[in-house]
Amino acid sequence: MMKSKEIIDRNLSEGREYIPEFEAYAICEEFGIPHPGYQFVKTMEEGTRAAEALGYPVVVKIVSPDVIHKSDVGGVIVGIESKEAFTAAYEELMRNVKEKAGEVTIDGVLVQKAMPKGVEVATGGLRNDQFGPVVMFGSGGILIEVFKDVAFRLAPLDKEEAKRQIEDTKASEILKGVRGAAPSDMDGVAELIVNTGRLVSELSEIDEIDFNPVMAYPTGCCVVDARIIVKKRV
């Protein structure tokens, strides 16, 4: 947990409440939260080496303290399958952000291994003034906003309670397998919820966590987009 504390303290000391995604993944590592392979780079040359090391296909995401919702400014490009495509995507990424976000600080680019499609779910957490740390689970992607398919629990929680939380959502039916699809790894998703609960309860500076989407597979699951917001506690 020392590395997570160092990341949070450094960002707060620099006046940043939004943890860069590559550092959010480093925090995830300490709490047993699965995520794709990734590298943070500052130049196109570093990026092409990172993509080769990770293996195509890859995704690129802008890393900027001024850009929270990356997709809104064209700050995410997926499905990059070659060195030539990477070069074009890197240039497009920079062009998009400059055109749509204006003069913003760009720290670099996150190069991330593209993950196979799975059942999209979401988990997260927040620190409530009345109840303390709370963990959320629900349908992933835009469905969480459209259908409000979410369930909440106080954190920390054990795996059995996490499974009951899953059952409280419509997402549980999809995870069990529909129209001949293989069932997803319910134990793996429950473990992710437990570890997300540990994260929000053990690190008091955490204000909000948003892991969306999470890809659930027949074996295991993977957080493919991570947002962590922190605040100084008096």
For each of these PLM feature ranges, what is it?
Residues 1-234:
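ATP-dependent carboxylate/acyl-activation modules
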